[in-house]
Design a protein with these regions (language model features):
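Sec-dependent N-terminal signal peptides
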Residues: 4-14
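Extracellular carbohydrate-recognition regions
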Residues: 19-38, 173-174
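Short carbohydrate-recognition loop motifs
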Residues: 43-64
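Extracellular/lumenal ectodomain signal focusing on beta-strand-rich modules
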Residues: 54, 83, 143, 158-159
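Extracellular ligand-binding interfaces
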Residues: 57-134, 151-153
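Extracellular carbohydrate recognition
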Residues: 136-139, 148-163, 167-173
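Extreme N-terminal leader/anchor segments
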Residues: 170-241, 245
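Aromatic-lined, polymer-binding surfaces characteristic
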Residues: 222-466
Length: 466
């Protein structure tokens, strides 16, 4: 009996429990994590997404990081809810993947998925067993492993939860995991579709050159937007808030020679405010406050801080091709990122990271959706009009090439016009009797601000071909 108790206690000490808990890799490598083949695993402070350290895996071609777990029994019901969540730091974009494999007691692969390494920085890795590959015949899992690509390299892991027993229903497909959600829920028909829309191409051709009238119209729209967004003097409150938040962010370059360390930035669903973690609203606070100070007061420190924050936000996952695990309702927290980016546009154009900034702004504005007309069954239109129409407009106007501005504005105006049709059933939008629906029902109070935003866009483009 004593021996049995000892074995149970020993196993509990070295094998992660079937009851999920976040592993932050703060002190030592858990006993359950072992490397097979050439390579090494260790605790590192070079990068972290929680606490002050992460798990560094230095791998060689074909090596694996093996993790023993308490047996996990899946079935057709709980495999929809169960999964794995973690964040992975990749230092350099690659054209390969890390393969995750989940094994039965015979060591056979029952479930697997590939995590693409095409981006640098912290990116989320969230996926339920439902959306993994594999024959899924044996649903009793006793271990999982990460399989290295056919090269030498390293990645960093943090914020690991396995098994996650209540996967976020709004898990967002992105460049890293494009098939981690079936997107069958109508509430997902806009926040979580940003990567799907990224696969679309414009059917409006890029003009070889603009006419003098088109150039004049773009200048008119540009001036209207500037007049609308400019204020008489820099608001001191937002500037003070930017510096206060920046101090809490504690951003500094990693001694690895690339990337940063600092306060983690995650989606609100994952944010632990008690630990001081930050989210999109904190990015907005810093970028907008520093932009006001740099633009109106010509404060060089604020200008430097603005780009430091932008670089850090991208490194943390607020970037092109990233869904940050879940991105739902982010539009409410990023509006001023766009309005103040317009004020900073000349400085952005001159910055060596210009393309990264602009691609981030376009991606999170979901401008890519407007490469095609609005789908007749598109739901949640009121959210898009209210929170992201201005972001789309500014992103379209911030193409350095005026020809691309014209193409993007043409696509956006067409998309908006096609979205203002009457929508069927309980699909969000405008109904034949003049009422509006949102979240599948009558939603009059929200509509005032929504239609005001649409009216602003009409005013910006009024009297032009756009």
């Amino acid at each position: 009996m004593k021996n049995s108790c000892f074995i149970v206690l020993f196993l509990l000490g070295i094998i992660p429990s079937a009851f999920a808990q976040l592993i932050g890799f703060e002190e030592e490598v858990p006993e359950a994590f072992k490397v097979s083949g050439k390579g090494e695993v260790k605790i590192s402070s070079l990068f972290y997404k929680e606490g002050e350290s992460s798990l560094e895996w230095d791998f060689q071609p074909g090596s694996t990081l093996d993790v023993q777990i308490a047996p996990l029994s899946l079935n057709t019901r709980n495999e929809k809810q169960f999964g794995i969540t973690l964040w992975i730091y990749n230092e350099k974009p690659q054209q390969d993947s890390i393969r995750f494999e989940f094994l039965n007691k015979e060591g056979e692969v029952s479930y697997w998925f590939s995590y693409r390494l095409q981006a640098a920085g912290w990116r989320a890795c969230w996926i339920s067993f439902e959306y993994m590959q594999g024959d899924k015949k044996d649903k009793k899992i006793v271990a999982y492993r990460l399989v290295a690509p056919q090269r030498k390299g390293r990645i960093f892991l943090d914020r690991l939860i396995f098994p996650e027993k209540k996967m976020n229903l709004r898990t967002t497909p992105d460049q890293q995991l494009p098939t981690n959600n079936g997107l069958s829920n109508r509430d997902l028909w806009h926040w979580c579709l940003v990567w799907k829309w990224e696969q679309q191409s414009y059917d409006i051709p890029l003009p070889s050159k603009l006419t003098s009238e088109q150039k004049k119209e773009l200048k008119t729209i540009e001036q209207r937007l500037t007049d609308f967004l400019e204020v008489k003097k820099a608001p001191q409150g937002p500037i003070n808030a930017a510096y206060k938040t920046f101090e809490k962010a504690a951003i500094s370059p990693s001694i690895a020679g690339t990337g940063f360390i600092g306060t983690p930035i995650v989606a609100p669903d994952e944010q632990d405010k008690k630990k001081g973690e930050m989210s999109w609203n904190d990015i907005e606070t810093m970028l907008s406050g520093f932009a006001y100070d740099a633009y109106y007061n010509q404060n060089e420190t604020s200008k430097k801080n603005y780009f430091t924050v932008f670089d850090y936000a991208i490194d943390q996952g607020f970037a092109y091709g990233s869904g940050m695990g879940t991105n739902h309702h982010y539009g409410y927290q990023v509006r001023k990122i766009y309005t103040t980016a317009w004020l900073m546009r000349d400085a952005i154009y001159k910055h060596p990271h210009r393309d990264a900034y602009l691609s981030t702004l376009r991606f999170w504005a979901a401008l890519q959706e407007t490469r095609q007309p609005c789908s007749p069954t598109r739901d949640e239109l009121l959210d898009s009009w209210h929170t992201l129409l201005m972001a789309k407009f500014i992103s379209a106007m911030m193409f350095p090439d005026a020809r691309e501005q014209a193409q993007a504005l043409s696509g956006l105006s067409r998309w908006l016009s096609s979205s203002l049709r009457y929508t069927p059933g309980t699909i969000g939008g405008i109904k034949v009797d003049g009422t509006t629906f949102h979240h599948g029902g009558f939603y009059p109070g929200y509509t005032t601000g929504v239609l005001a935003t649409v009216g602003e866009y009409i005013a910006f483009t009024n009297g032009t071909s756009f």
